[in-house]
């Protein structure tokens, strides 16, 4: 059983079989530090996940695992190279990651570990090469808000900086302190936005 491991931009080969480890991860389900992918067919889409994990607290992708936790296995070795393309070509700056393959019931599962980056934001390039920064909230990759971008920009300054928010942004942040979750309707009402134009 040959497995490939990508550390930074170096590819190494090692053997590893650990059904119990993968089953434990799968039993946790998808959450803020873990996402399942049935397959990798688009490097740009994977770049969004890499951006989200790198901009938040890091995490892992399990490739060859369906959303319901069923292990389907990776279909081809090309998926490892698509991950590398996502990290180096479609993430700016490039994302350092570690990839390990595991054999589970004769099927191959890829584990991709992404560390939180120091130099935020990490952008994912879309089909027109426009950069978009993502963050991870619960089990979803969400576009970073202008507030996030402003905070990251100011955090790069060595002396620190005071970040000011608009009245709408402050109301939204205050509401999020009280409640962990807000619906779109609640956000629109708090910020006095028209629901139709927001969507």
Predicted ranges, named:
Residues 1-13:
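Single conserved hydrophobic/aromatic residue that forms the stacking wall/gate
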Residues 14-199:
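Conserved N-terminal catalytic/coupling substructures associated with nucleotide/phosphate chemistry
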């Amino acid at each position: 059983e040959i497995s490939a491991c990508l550390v930074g931009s170096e590819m190494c080969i090692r053997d590893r079989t650990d059904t119990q480890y993968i089953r434990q991860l799968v039993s946790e389900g998808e959450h803020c530090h873990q996402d399942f992918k049935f397959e990798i067919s688009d490097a740009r889409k994977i770049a969004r996940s890499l951006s989200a994990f790198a901009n938040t607290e890091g995490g892992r992708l399990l490739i060859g695992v369906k959303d319901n936790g069923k292990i389907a296995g990776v279909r081809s070795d090309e998926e490892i190279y698509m991950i590398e393309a996502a990290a180096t070509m479609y993430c700016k700056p490039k994302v350092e990651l570690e990839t390990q393959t595991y054999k589970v019931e004769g099927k191959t599962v890829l584990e991709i570990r992404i560390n939180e980056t120091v130099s935020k934001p990490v952008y994912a390039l879309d089909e027109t090469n426009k950069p978009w920064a993502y963050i991870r909230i619960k089990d979803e990759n969400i576009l970073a808000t202008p507030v996030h971008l402003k905070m990251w920009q100011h955090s790069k300054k060595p002396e620190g900086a005071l970040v000011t928010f608009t009245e709408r942004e402050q109301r939204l942040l205050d509401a999020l302190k009280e409640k962990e979750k807000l619906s779109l309707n609640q956000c629109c009402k708090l910020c006095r936005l028209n629901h139709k134009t927001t969507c």
